[in-house]
Design a protein with these regions (language model features):
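Short alpha-helical segments enriched in small residues
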Residues: 1-107
């Protein structure tokens, strides 16, 4: 199944359930939001996204605890969960998806 088909399935499922979606992105720098919104019907369920490339932005906009980053690293499930929860709260959505990672030698 193609990425586009998977996104269409998600859009249809959330729309049928009257649910909404937001994103919190780091390493993908808005790429996930772009993929979602490139599919027809996304506006029915997609509310918005936050690109939080720097740790301070993850903390300020998404509520990620700096302790979580220092304890687990920025590339961790714990940070991704806090990012997703922060986006869900910021946009008042049912669901949120988060991506995290590092592009260089220094996290």
């Amino acid at each position: 199944m193609s990425t586009k088909n998977q996104i269409e399935e998600i859009i249809n499922l959330l729309n049928d359930r009257h649910e909404t979606l937001a994103t919190a992105e780091s390493i993908t720098a808005g790429g996930l939001s772009k993929e979602i919104t490139s599919v027809s019907g996304a506006s029915k369920i997609f509310v918005g996204g936050i690109t939080a490339y720097q740790n301070v932005i993850k903390e300020q906009l998404l509520g990620v605890e700096l302790e979580t980053i220092s304890k687990n690293s920025v590339v961790s499930e714990a940070v991704a969960l806090e990012m997703a929860n922060g986006a869900r709260k910021q946009f008042a959505t049912t669901w949120a998806i988060a991506t995290t990672g590092v592009a260089g030698p220094d996290p």
